[in-house]
């Protein structure tokens, strides 16, 4: 835990918090814009509350999987690339423990941010829906409890998925490879059609999360062999 606190202090979280808030505002604004424009044309933006939750979740996970890759770049890849991690390797701390702390920060922040963003954007959207009635039907306590469980499960899956780019980034300590691989992953899992998203099939994000955890384990295991 001390290592995690040190890394968080060193990283300076301001940029991440600002970026997350801006992303939340943009996603919420986009959801409102879609709903308003469809209603103005006499149509319905979402057929049900489930579909609205699906679209919100897809947007949030897509954005913050890429944010997760940026965290990996700042915490791991760029430090290897710029040789600054050599300084930390001189400390009486295991390389494996150091890398574990960094990846726990990346995965943990991604999980928390996705979960909170889902809650915030859904709350804002359905508050507006209660006034403007974009979506037919009511938001019941049963729907809310079901969606809360889904949010937690998919946030975990997305957090694990956000670690997959470390496999590509650590090969040559490449920042572009890390970011581009996260974008490709998002493109592959975020394709949607009315009422369906590939990423909404729980086995897909959980399988990718397993890959992310495995690649993280491999990076940690090879930390002592990895030249900075």
From Swiss-Prot:
Q: Which Pfam families match?
A: ABC2_membrane_4
Q: Which UniProt keywords apply?
A: Cell membrane, Membrane, Transmembrane, Transmembrane helix
Q: Mind telling me which residue stretches traverse the membrane in this protein? A: 14-34, 53-73, 108-128, 148-168, 178-198, 200-220
The places in or outside the cell where this protein is found are: Cell membrane
For membrane topology, the record states: Multi-pass membrane protein
> What's the main place this protein lives?
membrane
A single GO CC term, please?
A: plasma membrane
Record's superkingdom?
Answer: Bacteria
Please list the coiled coil stretches: none
This protein is called Uncharacterized protein YcbO
Q: What is the lineage of its organism?
A: Bacteria, Bacillati, Bacillota, Bacilli, Bacillales
As recorded in Swiss-Prot or TrEMBL, the protein's gene is named ycbO
